[in-house]
Swiss-Prot record:
Its EC number(s): 3.6.4.-
Intervals of motif DEEQ box: 709-712
Function according to Swiss-Prot or TrEMBL: Couples transcription and DNA repair by recognizing RNA polymerase (RNAP) stalled at DNA lesions. Mediates ATP-dependent release of RNAP and its truncated transcript from the DNA, and recruitment of nucleotide excision repair machinery to the damaged site.
UniProtKB keywords: ATP-binding, Cytoplasm, DNA damage, DNA repair, DNA-binding, Helicase, Hydrolase, Nucleotide-binding
Residues engaged in binding ATP: G604, D605, V606, G607, F608, G609, K610, T611
Listed name of the protein: Transcription-repair-coupling factor
Gene it is expressed from: mfd
Length: 1120
């Protein structure tokens, strides 16, 4: 074993240097944690142009977990193993040391299932589908995640690791083309000459592996596998959550990660060796926990393989590392630290700036290649400007190979500490500018957020604009004049049915999920009710506009602040801002500097960084240069959140000379009186408080910014007081699941809206399970969290149930400590318990729902919710948002009484929360919650009864339309009619084209929202790209939509065709006399005017040209 010394920060540079010098040699760089492995992998592509550098990720689950790892991680591991075994060139692998203990499939496994496709190769859809299933791909209706594929007609869509999505078009028995497509838009982006497909999992289920599993399972665990869903799933060829923990049972033998390379040299340090020993100890602990849990329950279907069966031993791996060719590295930083440290150690009394000293260092090392590394684009631009000010030239680089001598090289390079070698001097901007150095998030921004709300399920209540509340039963096809046509079947009172043609689907709006009385078809009651509501909406709209106008009339002095000091404040933020955060911050900055009062809503999912955005606003106002003693008030709904915000603000604003206080029930009355006096005199710059801040005895000296966190938690009287402040102060409201009232205000343009939909770096979705109360699973969940160094929440909605839960926890997890918090305790006692939980002084916090708002403890990542069916949807979502807020996977267990039969609405709530696991689900949750509980009021004086009259969607549409009319905007008012088009053509989306009925309804809904011909054509292009060439019936539908748009412009209520021409009936109130007379005059031989606003146009028609003829007729009418 060789030993070498170099700076710790140069670890990747050193590994690349060795790799480059030994062209025929494989290397493994082993590090002591997963985060460092990923960081070094990203650095490697700057230090080397060699493409044969790989990263093997760790699972995001713990040993003996009964949930499966993230599919992206599973597929990335499989992809890496495939490349290692199929690439004959020398390779460098970077990985977490613990992965060296993993038992993996035999090394020839991935080469057996390696598949290369290219255009014109002979392959049928069925053949490829079978191979994909064998390669662990899952067949779904649509492809959205890594490892999924879908079949639609002559097209297969497949998602590979990356993720990268490909569309394979077939023509009979060969592949016609392969295209890459965008997962979010489903639109293809470029053609590919070949496509390499390998297994997306380390386990494939075929006759051989399933046979091995059966035999090995029998040998290890005996025959007692009756009613075991894991065993039954696997022998049936289906995946099962957590079956990865039984991997060795599927193969005759296993290989190690080292076996996948050709006699590699391992580069490691003593920390890596220590990590291997600690991982083995953890595995042993988890094994004991799982074994003990299994003993408590007969036929537990997660049998535990011994650590020796599941992993290689630490002693064997350590012995392998210590072989003669491997390299043990140690670190010497003292000399380098003093050299680089001297740059940034400029004292206050020195005349030289930090950059004067930097350029002295550069001048002394100009014989070397000097590289200044910036972590982000903003610092890169600042460094460029500084270099130019010092009259040096610079060279922008992306790779180390591009670096030149006698010039300063700069680039965006993920390096966090300076170091030097004989040939190079690396200096990081993070040390020069005191900024953070992290890695930008590669997660794509969530697309079409509000479009995801546009679901309509069979059995849901709906509202027809003309006929009122009904129940959507299903899509149904009818034959009309020998042609099939899709209709929405709506049930009304008295078992009456209404059939709405799909091209008129926009007349149908979702009502919600409350049980309601159905309207009667043909009754005048609906029209009377709608007309009355329209008058009330007009009043509300006028009031809303007056509020907005009154605010705009209040001129505000544009906020000015010190940009250099602001940059320093921003640099103290320990994370990279997401794209959406930066956009929201820029929106706020524009609001504060434009001379008008700000009224903005920040909608961002739980844990997506709304608080940091608010803090930027606070800084801009509190440090305003042109205001005398400006003040900021932050109003929060709970004492716990107030205390947390106060602590965070104190830490974040440290060193900026701002006086920050909190006012809530934890503050003594004596201290509260002092705070009130200091607020009135202007001595306090930032006050954070609960509803106490909204009391009439609170006087501000110069309140310039009001921040409202989770506004929906405040009562009506408190909201009225908040409104009185809005006329003189800037207002910023924040919400994770925006209540419809607030969201409606934003969508109607009366309140500015910023959406934060991009998750932070490395954020993982919370795994959510709905299950009967089970002490074994609860014990296992709590112990697993404890063993990975974390803490757990145990939420009990009712205080009276806490004693029982406490007794049960004493029995099932006696080794864990806990404390209780609930609303009947004194605020000071709650504060004391929460402080201890923050500090990690006990393992489990048993609490009521008082923790639902804003609690942020990154070490607490397991939550059990007792009797979850008794909580509302937004409550469940907010509670779940307390976990998984860092880089650690969160686990939420929603328990219900095992013998309890759930009501339909309770069951639906739990289904929604379980299925809404994706990051950024808050908007979907808000919509579902509105469906389940109805909307709140808009301006305080009216509750949700009005909305129940017509349903949420129609109410929103009516409100938007009325506000637009009152604001005199160029938006067409509600059409008093819907054109009915009957051209005797088949109009529907065939099952062979889109087989999933829910997707088909969603597409029909989207079609109903198309507002012009360009949108129709774009939609058509998207359909062709996603599903293949349009069937004639679908094409007819889109053509009829375009004709319908023309009918709107011409006030045509009916357009019918027959063998001898068209019959047009104009809307009764439309004045079309001039156009009709001109048209009749021009085409007197082909036209007839009939009573009831009808126009007959005579022309022999056939199916193939009927669309063309109809278009020609309407365009002629339009242009005449």
């Amino acid at each position: 074993m060789l030993q070498q010394k170099f700076p710790a920060t140069a670890k990747c540079f050193f590994a690349i240097d060795n790799f480059t010098k030994h062209l025929n040699q494989d290397f493994i760089l082993s590090v002591n944690n997963e985060e460092e492995a990923l960081k070094l992998y990203k650095q490697a592509f700057f230090f080397s142009s060699n493409e044969n550098i790989y990263y093997f990720p760790s699972y995001d689950t713990i040993p003996y977990d009964y949930t499966s790892p993230n599919t992206n991680i599973i597929s990335r591991r499989a992809e890496t193993l495939t490349k290692l075994i199929t690439n004959n060139n020398s390779k460098l692998l970077i990985t977490h040391a613990a992965n060296l203990l993993n038992k993996l499939p035999p090394k020839d496994f991935f080469s057996k299932y390696f598949l290369k496709l290219y255009p014109k190769i002979k392959f049928t859809i069925d053949e490829l589908s079978m191979l994909l299933v064998e390669n662990s791909f899952t067949r779904n209706i649509s492809s959205n995640d890594v490892g999924e594929f879908s079949v639609r007609g002559e097209i297969i869509d497949i998602i590979l690791p990356g993720p990268k999505a490909y569309r394979i078009n077939f023509s009979w028995d060969y592949i016609e083309s392969i295209k890459e497509f965008d997962i979010n838009t489903q639109i293809s982006t470029k053609y590919c000459t070949e496509l390499v497909i390998s297994p997306v999992s380390e386990i494939v289920l075929n006759s051989k592996t399933i046979g091995n599993f059966k035999n090995n399972y029998l040998r290890n665990f005996g025959v007692n596998h009756t009613d075991n869903p894991l065993y039954e799933a696997v022998i049936s060829g289906r995946k099962f959550p957590g079956y990865e923990q039984l991997l060795p049972l599927f193969y005759d033998s296993c290989s190690s990660l080292v076996d996948y390379l050709n006699d590699p040299i391992c580069i490691f340090d003593n920390l890596s060796k220590q990590e291997i020993l600690e991982f083995e100890n953890s595995c042993n602990d988890f094994y004991l926990a799982r074994s003990n849990a299994n003993k408590l329950k007969v036929n537990n279907f997660y049998p535990a393989l011994s650590p020796a069966s599941l992993y290689f031993t630490a002693s064997a791996i350590t012995e392998l590392l210590e072989q003669k060719n491997n390299i043990l590295i140690s670190y010497e930083n003292s000399e380098q630290a003093s050299l680089i440290g001297n740059i940034s150690s400029t004292s206050f009394m020195e005349k030289k700036t930090i950059f004067d000293k930097l350029f002295e260092l550069i001048k002394a090392n100009f014989h070397k290649k000097i590289i200044i590394c910036s972590s982000v684009l903003s610092s890169f631009e600042r460094i460029k400007s500084i270099i130019q000010n010092y009259k040096y030239t610079f060279n922008e680089i992306n790779k180390l190979d591009d670096a030149k001598a006698s010039v300063i090289n700069i680039g965006i390079i993920p390096l966090n500490q300076s170091f030097y070698t004989k040939e190079y001097l690396f200096i990081t901007s993070s040390e020069l500018l005191e900024e953070k150095t992290l890695y930008t998030n590669t997660n794509k921004k969530l697309k079409n957020i509000l479009l995801e709300l546009d679901n309509l399920a069979e059995g849901e209540f709906v509202v027809h604009k003309d006929h009122g509340i009904g129940q959507f039963l299903k899509l149904e096809a009818f034959e009309i004049q020998g042609k099939l046509h899709d209709f929405l079947k709506i049930l009304y009172s008295g078992n009456d049915k209404l059939y709405v043609p799909v091209e008129n689907i926009e007349v149908i709006k979702k009502y919600g999920s409350n049980n309601v009385e159905l309207d009667k078809l043909g009754s005048a009651a609906w029209h009377k009710s709608k007309a009355k509501l329209k008058d009330r909406i007009k009043e509300i709209s006028l009031h809303l506009i007056q509020i907005a106008a009154k605010r705009k009339l209040n001129i505000s002095t544009p906020i000015e602040f010190d940009l250099e000091e602001y940059d320093k404040f921003c640099a103290n933020f320990p994370f990279i801002e997401t794209e959406d955060q930066l956009t929201a911050i820029n929106d706020i900055r524009k609001d504060l500097t434009n001379g008008m009062l700000m009224d903005r809503l920040i909608c961002g999912d739980v844990g997506f960084g709304k608080t940091e955005v608010a803090m930027r606003a606070v800084f801009m106002v509190a440090k305003s240069l042109n205001e005398y003693l400006p003040q900021v008030a932050v109003v929060v709904p709970t004492t716990i959140l107030c205390s947390q915000h106060f602590s965070r603000f104190i830490e974040r604003f440290k060193g900026f000379g701002l006086n920050i206080k909190q006012l809530s029930s934890v503050v003594s009355s004596q201290e509260a009186n002092i705070i009130r006096l200091e607020l009135a005199s202007g001595k306090i710059n930032i006050i954070i408080g609960t509803h106490t801040l909204l009391h009439k005895n609170i006087k501000f000296f110069n309140l310039k910014l009001l921040i409202i966190d989770e506004e929906q938690h405040f009562g009506v009287s408190q909201k009225e007081f908040l409104k009185s402040l809005k006329y003189s102060s800037h207002v910023l409201a924040m919400s994770a699941t925006p209540i419809p009232r607030t969201l409606q205000m934003s969508l109607t343009g009366l309140k500015e809206l910023s959406i934060i939909a991009t998750p932070p770096l490395n954020r993982l979705e919370v795994r959510t399970s709905v299950m009967p109360f089970d002490t074994v699973i609860i014990r296992d969940a709590l112990l697993r969290e404890h063993f990975r160094g974390g803490r757990s929440f145990y939420v009990v909605p009712r205080i009276k149930d806490m004693e029982d839960i406490e007794k049960q926890l004493k029995q099932i997890v006696p080794e864990l400590s806990y404390k209780i918090a609930h609303g009947k305790m004194t605020p000071s006692k709650i504060d004391e318990v929460m402080s201890e939980f923050y500090a990690g002084k006990f393992d489990i916090l048993i609490s009521t729902t008082i923790i639902e708002s804003g609690i942020d403890i990154t070490e607490a990542n397991t939550m059990i919710i007792h009797n979850a069916d008794t909580l509302g949807l937004s409550q469940l979502y907010q509670l779940r948002g307390r976990i998984g807020r860092g880089k650690i996977r969160g686990y939420a267990y929603l328990t219900v009484a095992s013998n309890k039969k759930l009501m339909q609405h309770s069951l639906r709530r739990l289904e929604i929360i379980q299925n809404s696991c994706a990051l950024g689900s808050g908007f979907t949750i808000a919509s579902h919650d509105a469906d389940l509980r109805g909307f709140g009021n808009l301006i305080g004086e009216e509750q949700s009864g009005q909305i129940r009259e017509v349903g949420a969607e129609l109410y929103q549409e009516m409100l938007e339309e009325q506000i637009a009319l009152l604001k005199d905007e160029s938006i067409v008012s509600e059409q008093s009619f819907i054109p009915n088009i009957n051209l005797g053509l088949s109009v529907f989306i065939p099952d062979h084209y889109v087989s999933d009925s829910a997707l088909k309804i969603a597409l029909y809904r989207r079609i109903g929202n198309l507002s012009n011909e360009i949108e129709v054509e774009k939609f058509k292009d998207e359909m062709i790209d996603r599903f293949g060439l349009l069937p004639i019936e679908f094409n007819n539908l889109l053509d009829i939509v375009k004709i319908k748009l023309l009918c709107f412009k011409l006030n045509i209520e009916n357009l019918d065709s027959g063998d001898d021409g068209f019959v047009i009936r104009f809307y009764k109130n439309a004045d079309m006399s001039d156009k009709i007379l001109k048209f009749v005059s021009r085409y007197s031989n082909q036209t007839k005017i009939k009573p009831n606003n009808k126009l007959v146009f005579i022309k022999k028609l056939v199916d193939k040209n009927i669309i063309t003829e109809a278009n020609q007729l309407l365009w002629t009418l339009l242009e005449i």
